[in-house]
Amino acid sequence: MAHHNGPRKKTRYKFKKDLRKRGIPPVTSVIQSFEIGQRVHVVVEPSVQKGMPHRRFHGKTGTVIGQRGRAWLLEVRDGDSVKQVIARPQHLKAQKV
């Protein structure tokens, strides 16, 4: 039988974009930067596969704790535990204050 357990399984509707928002994201989403301690939302950009966090963290809010190359290191609560997530800036949105 075929292998059905890829990293994007069960994401048919979760990662779907609106009709008018399809295509590559603007450059401003790539060059955005964050402060350490800043709160950010994990919103997966399905057209960019590099640096994509696990589907479990889509829609969660975390705190920036560092940077790893072009990606950002986040602390995200997952149930009772706190997990570290590495994601590129295309998949992050700053929380409005």
Swiss-Prot record:
This is Large ribosomal subunit protein eL21. Belongs to the eukaryotic ribosomal protein eL21 family. SUPFAM superfamilies: Translation proteins SH3-like domain (SSF50104). It holds the Pfam family Ribosomal_L21e. GO terms for cellular component: ribonucleoprotein complex; ribosome. One of its GO terms (molecular function) is structural constituent of ribosome. GO terms for biological process: translation. The lineage of its organism: Archaea, Methanobacteriati, Methanobacteriota, Stenosarchaea group, Methanomicrobia. PANTHER family: 60S RIBOSOMAL PROTEIN L21. Keywords: Ribonucleoprotein, Ribosomal protein. InterPro entries: Ribosomal_eL21, Ribosomal_eL21_arc, Ribosomal_eL21_CS, Ribosomal_eL21_sf, Translation_prot_SH3-like_sf.
